Amino acid sequence: MAKKVVGFIKLQIPAGAANPAPPVGPALGQKGVNIMEFCKQFNAKTQSQSGTIIPVVITVYSDKSFTFITKTPPAAVLLVKEAGLQKGSGEPNKNKVGKVTEEQVRKIAELKMPDLNAFDIDGAMQMIRGTARSMGIVVEG
């Protein structure tokens, strides 16, 4: 018989840097998950992407076991990295803080494609352009 799902936990954790401190510890502790076991598995799986924020969905079962799925980094994080910025604009409609090319947008869209709700690469690129616009980043080309 299949295990009964007790809940889902969605977190955004820096790759290779999960530790029992907040926000990871309290979120997993509420569901009774072995926090250190999750941290070890997550850090091992995301070691190669260190420094990037990785969204993770943890499925908790009734016997306190868990599985987790890592997603692609948020589009905003990828855009900031491509544009070479620290963060997006506080006033995106007035202050433009950086520029990305159409090729960079395509690269991000191809990376994000599995997690985006888009049928083709053009639809995914349109979503990435919208994210860039809302961050005060100009798309050239």
Swiss-Prot record:
One annotated Gene Ontology cellular component of this protein: cytosolic large ribosomal subunit
Database matches in Gene3D superfamilies: Ribosomal protein L11, C-terminal domain (1.10.10.250), Ribosomal protein L11/L12, N-terminal domain (3.30.1550.10)
MF term (GO), any: large ribosomal subunit rRNA binding
Domain of life, source organism: Bacteria
Protein function: Forms part of the ribosomal stalk which helps the ribosome interact with GTP-bound translation factors.
NCBIfam families (alphabetical): L11_bact
The protein's name: Large ribosomal subunit protein uL11
HAMAP family named in the record: Ribosomal_uL11
Cysteine pairings via disulfide bonds: none
PTM per Swiss-Prot/TrEMBL: One or more lysine residues are methylated.
Transmembrane regions listed in the UniProt entry: none
Assembly information from the UniProt record: Part of the ribosomal stalk of the 50S ribosomal subunit. Interacts with L10 and the large rRNA to form the base of the stalk. L10 forms an elongated spine to which L12 dimers bind in a sequential fashion forming a multimeric L10(L12)X complex.
